[in-house]
Swiss-Prot record:
Coiled-coil positions: none
Protein name: Ashwin
Organism: Gallus gallus (Chicken)
GO cellular component: nucleus; tRNA-splicing ligase complex
InterPro entries for the chain: Ashwin (IPR024887)
């Protein structure tokens, strides 16, 4: 039994030594063959030009740049080190599964190919039989009658009347109102003219008071707007009853 136990221990040590030797070989690509280097580069999705025959030196340079494993710190043989080794072993298959699922999801989606013609396409507009575009079509005939228009009404009345509902009687009333307004304005203007030509005469028994404005001595001090002009030489005095 003791011999079998020793044999098992010896076999385990040999396996560990072989695993370490393989990992050490990955850190020294000069010892690897060209075929192995090509396989590792293809697994890492690193393109190698088929036209150009690369030497082993070129493959080793690519391997060192992209595919060489990163250095990792050796864990101590304590309880914490054993726990970290277990976590690493558990995380390795998870990361592989995630990468596989991501690649599968990308493959399920259809590939989008952009052609040169798609960027330089011109905008197409549908044309009618007459050659005019749909945007420039006139409005339908039914909408013209229903439009809202503002009529020339007196200043007091600020209402909107639709052209369709307006009758002839309403039009006549509007015209009569305009004529009345014109007559009122004419009478007001005639009254003002009469007042200017015939000023009010003073009533008997009342005193006439003349209002005088104080004019400065120097006319140069006055502004241009307040200076007397030739047309306004006579000042009309106001008479109070």
């Amino acid at each position: 039994m003791a011999a079998q136990g020793r044999g098992r221990v010896g076999g385990g040590k040999e396996e560990r030594v072989s695993a370490r030797s393989d990992s050490e070989l990955l850190l020294h690509p000069e010892l690897l063959s060209e075929e192995f280097l090509l396989l590792t580069l293809e697994q890492k999705n690193i393109l190698v030009k088929n036209d150009v025959k690369m030497d082993k030196d070129g493959l080793t340079d690519l391997y060192i740049q992209h595919a060489i494993p990163l250095p990792q710190r050796d864990l101590p043989k304590s309880r914490w080190g054993k726990m970290m080794e277990k976590k690493r072993k558990q995380n390795e298959p998870k990361s592989e599964n995630k990468s596989v699922t991501a690649v599968g999801g990308l493959r399920k989606r259809p590939l989008i190919v952009f052609d040169g013609s798609s960027t330089s396409t011109s905008i197409k507009v549908k044309k009618t039989e007459n050659g005019a575009t749909d945007r420039l079509k006139p409005p339908p005939a039914g909408s013209i009658t229903n439009t809202v228009r503002r009529l020339s009404a007196p200043s007091n009345a600020s209402t909107y009347i639709s052209a369709s509902s307006l009758s002839e009687d309403a039009k006549l009333e509007v015209r009569n109102n305009e004529a009345k307004q014109n007559n009122i304005s004419k009478t007001n203007s005639s009254v003002l003219v009469n007042l200017k030509t015939h000023p009010l005469s003073p009533v008997a028994g009342t005193t006439v008071v003349k209002l005088k404005r104080s004019v400065p001595k120097d006319e140069s001090d006055l502004p241009n707007d307040l200076k007397p002009t030739e047309a306004k030489k006579k000042i009309q005095h106001c008479t109070w009853p």
